[in-house]
Amino acid sequence: MGGLASGGDVEPGLPVEVRGSNGAFYKGFVKDVHEDSVTIFFENNWQSERQIPFGDVRLPPPADYNKEITEGDEVEVYSRANEQEPCGWWLARVRMMKGDFYVIEYAACDATYNEIVTLERLRPVNPNPLATKGSFFKVTMAVPEDLREACSNENVHKEFKKALGANCIFLNITNSELFILSTTEAPVKRASLLGDMHFRSLRTKLLLMSRNEEATKHLETSKQLAAAFQEEFTVREDLMGLAIGTHGANIQQARKVPGVTAIELGEETCTFRIYGETPEACRQARSYLEFSEDSVQVPRNLVGKVIGKNGKVIQEIVDKSGVVRVRVEGDNDKKNPREEGMVPFIFVGTRENISNAQALLEYHLSYLQEVEQLRLERLQIDEQLRQIGLGFRPPGSGRGSGGSDKAGYSTDESSSSSLHATRTYGGSYGGRGRGRRTGGPAYGPSSDVSTASETESEKREEPNRAGPGDRDPPTRGEESRRRPTGGRGRGPPPAPRPTSRYNSSSISSVLKDPDSNPYSLLDTSEPEPPVDSEPGEPPPASARRRRSRRRRTDEDRTVMDGGLESDGPNMTENGLEDESRPQRRNRSRRRRNRGNRTDGSISGDRQPVTVADYISRAESQSRQRPPLERTKPSEDSLSGQKGDSVSKLPKGPSENGELSAPLELGSMVNGVS
């Protein structure tokens, strides 16, 4: 029991004996020292921690204290009053001794109580008196933050405690201070001298202990990895920075691969060792760390096209492949072996990235070589064409003005971009003339050119197939619409020519020449002879009416529009100027249905304005005005024959198209029975 009491290593605190209410002394530990009491906590916490006055506390007997026990001596017996209390030291007296057994009598009890005990439960009476204020001394030392965890273990203070001569050293967790308790004053003076040295040596010991623990773990890991899969490779010294990555990013990425257990790096030998559970995990981690350098030979004449404008092509290869960089070796750089006429392109990156870059570059080189072969074939074809006499037509020849510079085929000395496009020459030699090329976008026909060529051919064909009697003279509206103007018909319209011929002499002119063309009345404009022509010469063919190839719509003016719309004022039946009549809607079939129907149907015919309409209009005007005096004797008979039929006509032209009687009269005027 004495060793247990004196060894301050078992519990954090100064061991003492505390007197209970029954007079027995129980084992406790001093946790703190106050003015008139000490803070005690008991063994096994059978009682709560509390402050006890100095008069109820004493120190345990010294470890070397030994006294022979005889009959009649007072002793202390280690016993307990009941099962609920722990054992304590009770005062008793020896009544009888027989071998190793002692009969003792307790003195604390009122009634005499005897018990037989062995020698292990007996000890001489404790020679230490009850404690006083000067029985305990305490020293506190502030503990650095990095050493608080280490100071919580009392074993690290063993040498420090021995050097001080203190009874107990422990860390107070409440205020993170090191408590030094002693029963003498000497340790208090030594603590200020050895405190700093103790903390410094403690920090060094902790560092060494952590290294030893790390080495132990490494040893265990190495034993486990010896039976696992392993990958070992070496990286060039100048590429070690790329392999490690920024702040070790590549190594961290490799360690995150599932199945990788450890990665070792030999900085002196630039060697990586990868340990993993599977060979696939080791190879994947290796692909992140193994950086190297490789080159691709590029023909000298294709270097510019491989690099591209402003390095666009080679930059695309770098971005897609993932290599770190690419270097084009100059002629003065002889580090890497090169072939004759070739320029090395040196790529730096991982094995996989370099392989991707080589595949992209080789494909681009094959494409450039095929394009060059196609260009040479085209040059051979052009040379053969020159030899057989056709020759090579330069781009833009035969095109309209302003079109030769915008579209066309480039020559053999064109830029490399024009060589990528596929061109055809078939449309330049087998078309319908220089203005009808349809081979490609460079020779696309223009609508103005094609229309002009077709119109001129029709001009040359019209005099042969159309006579002077079976052509209809164009109306003023049609002639003004077909008269060539500047540009494409977007210029200012021609000056108007006021006329009202059909109001004054339309009837007389028809009666004078019944066999003439009645539709000539609708032409209200006089043809202008060209300036260079003689008065007696006929107008040139270009001034004749040309039939437009464009399909007419409802907005186009027709023969009736030209007859009803004149530039001058119209005369009404009263001889006064009136506004122009509303235009009738045009129908394209009216120009095709000029003849009279045999059945006399008017509703389904919808003919344009005929001569009979003008005759009817003139008769209605003659009722209000005196008749014309320009009639001849040869006209009287004709007028007499027609007077009866004219008198049966309505006063004005019908607006709903009922023109059956005028159609018959028109047939008689034209001389058709």
Curated annotation (Swiss-Prot):
The tandem Agenet-like domains preferentially recognize trimethylated histone peptides. Disordered region at the C-terminus undergoes liquid-liquid phase separation (LLPS) for the formation of a membraneless compartment that stores mRNAs. Interacts with FMR1. Interacts with FXR1. Interacts with TDRD3. Interacts with HABP4. Interacts with CYFIP2 but not with CYFIP1. (Microbial infection) Interacts with Sindbis virus non-structural protein 3 (via C-terminus); this interaction inhibits the formation of host stress granules on viral mRNAs and the nsp3-FXR2 complexes bind viral RNAs and probably orchestrate the assembly of viral replication complexes. Keywords: Cytoplasm, Phosphoprotein, Repeat, RNA-binding, Synapse. InterPro entries: Agenet-like_dom (IPR008395), FMR1 (IPR040148), FMR1-like_C_core (IPR022034), FMRP_KH0 (IPR040472), FXR1_C1 (IPR032172), KH_dom (IPR004087), KH_dom_type_1 (IPR004088), KH_dom_type_1_sf (IPR036612). The modification Phosphoserine is found at S192, S410, S450, S453, S533, S566, S580, S601, S603. mRNA-binding protein that acts as a regulator of mRNAs translation and/or stability, and which is required for adult hippocampal neurogenesis. Specifically binds to AU-rich elements (AREs) in the 3'-UTR of target mRNAs. Promotes formation of some phase-separated membraneless compartment by undergoing liquid-liquid phase separation upon binding to AREs-containing mRNAs: mRNAs storage into membraneless compartments regulates their translation and/or stability. Residues 14-60, 73-125 form the Agenet-like domain. Residues 411-421 have a biased composition (Polar residues). The modification Phosphothreonine is found at T411, T598. The gene is FXR2. Residues 456-482, 620-635 have a biased composition (Basic and acidic residues). This is RNA-binding protein FXR2. The lineage of its organism: Eukaryota, Metazoa, Chordata, Craniata, Vertebrata. SUPFAM superfamilies: Eukaryotic type KH-domain (KH-domain type I) (SSF54791). The modification Phosphotyrosine is found at Y78. It is found in: Cytoplasm, Cytoplasmic ribonucleoprotein granule; Cytoplasm; Postsynapse. Residues 583-595 have a biased composition (Basic residues). Its main location: cytoplasm. Belongs to the FMR1 family. It comes from Homo sapiens (Human). Residues 232-261, 295-324 form the KH domain. Residues 389-673 are annotated as: Disordered. GO terms for cellular component: cytoplasm; cytoplasmic stress granule; cytosol; membrane; neuron projection; nucleus; postsynapse; presynapse. CDD domains: KH_I_FXR2_rpt1, KH_I_FXR2_rpt2, KH_I_FXR2_rpt3, Tudor_Agenet_FXR2_rpt1, Tudor_Agenet_FXR2_rpt2. The keyword RNA-binding applies. Residues 525-535 have a biased composition (Acidic residues). Expressed in all tissues examined including heart, brain, kidney and testis. In brain, present at high level in neurons and especially in the Purkinje cells at the interface between the granular layer and the molecular layer (at protein level). The keyword Cytoplasm applies. GO terms for molecular function: identical protein binding; mRNA 3'-UTR binding; protein heterodimerization activity; protein homodimerization activity; RNA binding; translation regulator activity.
